[in-house]
Amino acid sequence: MLYPLSYMLLWTDSIVEQYKKFYLFRFDL
């Protein structure tokens, strides 16, 4: 149970990073 939970957290964290990059890129234009 602990492993999938940490994996999900890591996965959501990477998604948040992708959104940050996407929005920063948009606002840069």
Swiss-Prot record:
It comes from the Eukaryota. The keyword Chloroplast applies. One of its GO terms (cellular component) is chloroplast. It is found in: Plastid, Chloroplast. Keywords: Chloroplast, Plastid. This is Uncharacterized 3.7 kDa protein in psbV-trnM intergenic region. It comes from Trieres chinensis.
